[in-house]
């Protein structure tokens, strides 16, 4: 969102990720849906863990939406559950990005080591969810 993905992409390779995608036009929920669909799993995202740029939530609460919002909801909405999450945060999770961060799926046993290595390189990361058995995406 505020830095290029090259350093993070290079750092994660040594940890043998299960999946990596850049969060761009489909927004976080759309790309999580793609990851879940193509991998035959479910993705559970923690709403409280999502990084949000300063001022973005306030704009979403005021009803500001991008043109991609309805298209992303149409693309992934049938497979995405957002019950109990504010509409403003849901809108941000569907918001298309031109240069979003990476959505990385790592086996739990390697996640903490990657977090340490990324931190040592000065990379921002947030653990925002888990992969589970099932299908679809749940933002809770």
Residue spans for each PLM region:
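Glycine-/charge-enriched secondary-structure boundary and capping motifs
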Residues: 14-140
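Active-site glycine-rich loop that binds ribose-phosphate moieties when present
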Residues: 1-12
């Amino acid at each position: 969102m505020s830095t290029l993905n090259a350093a993070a992409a290079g750092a994660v390779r040594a940890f043998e990720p299960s999946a990596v995608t850049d969060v761009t036009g489909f927004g976080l929920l759309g790309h999580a849906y793609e990851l879940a669909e193509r991998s035959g799993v479910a993705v559970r995202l923690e709403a409280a863990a999502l990084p949000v740029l300063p001022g973005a939530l306030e704009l979403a609460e005021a009803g500001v939406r991008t043109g991609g919002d309805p298209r992303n909801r149409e693309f992934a909405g049938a497979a995405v559950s957002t019950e109990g999450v504010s509409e403003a945060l849901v809108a941000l999770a569907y918001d298309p990005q031109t240069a979003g961060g990476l959505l990385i799926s790592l086996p739990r046993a390697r996640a903490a080591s990657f977090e340490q290595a990324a931190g040592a390189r000065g990379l921002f990361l947030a653990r925002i969810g888990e992969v589970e058995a099932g299908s679809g995406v749940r933002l809770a």
